[in-house]
Amino acid sequence: MKLNRVESTRSRHRRVRRKVGGTGDRPRLAVFRSHQHIYAQVIDDQQQHTLVAASSLEPEFKTQYGEGDTCAASTQIGKLIAERSLAKGIQKVVFDRGGKLYHGRVKALAEAAREAGLEF
């Protein structure tokens, strides 16, 4: 049976989540990309707690950068999540692309977070 795009993404996401988990020492940087926005969270899976979050829906982001459906917006979210993580003392993370391909907006967010100082 042929899988459609949504089922393929869900299957990839489950496969990645089996292998990737965040700890207190090295939390998980989870990225969710919708059609119009992008979200990033730094999560400690052992405590089941979100440590840091950033998204293109935040009012201060919208007033500064506009819509969140471009690579430029993803780059800004990557920088923002890295700044907030470093401010809380989180330097190393495990990257979780959320079943999406490492391309386009997901790649832009990851590279911006790396340039801003996060290690993964």
UniProtKB/Swiss-Prot annotation:
GO biological process, one term: translation
Molecular function in Gene Ontology: 5S rRNA binding; structural constituent of ribosome
CDD domains: Ribosomal_L18_L5e
Alphabetized UniProt keyword annotations: Ribonucleoprotein, Ribosomal protein, RNA-binding, rRNA-binding
Segments of skewed composition (Basic and acidic residues): 1-10
Segments of this protein annotated with the region Disordered: 1-26
InterPro entries per record: Ribosomal_uL18_bac-type, Ribosomal_uL18_bac/euk
Any one Gene Ontology cellular component term annotated for this protein: cytosolic large ribosomal subunit
Pfam families named in the record: Ribosomal_L18p
Biased composition (Basic residues): 11-20
HAMAP family according to UniProt: Ribosomal_uL18_B (MF_01337_B)
Similarity comment: Belongs to the universal ribosomal protein uL18 family.
Free-text function comment from the UniProt entry: This is one of the proteins that bind and probably mediate the attachment of the 5S RNA into the large ribosomal subunit, where it forms part of the central protuberance.
Assembly behavior: Part of the 50S ribosomal subunit; part of the 5S rRNA/L5/L18/L25 subcomplex. Contacts the 5S and 23S rRNAs.
Protein name as it appears in the record: Large ribosomal subunit protein uL18
Gene name of the record: rplR
